């Protein structure tokens, strides 16, 4: 739902996959790919979780982070009274601005900063 600025970042990039039980059936791989399609980078796996695809690990990570934030915002908003959606032209504008501004380096700055933070905390994530 295009409810928040964070949610608008991914307008038209989200696909949905029906829950099929535990992911033990290899045939589900084909359906996941079909639901992702050619133009989607994110999947909401109904009754299960989220999946993101990126050109790089930092891109996939940051898209997952903001998709999760958008979901949290939506759940919190829907728990209250009636939600107010931005006008369709504003939704399109925000999405276009985000896509133009992200470029090919999406997530790199954040990912590098997170790795530095882990190193400072003494994490052995890289071993």
Residue map of PLM features:
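Glycine-rich flexible loops
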Residues: 1-127
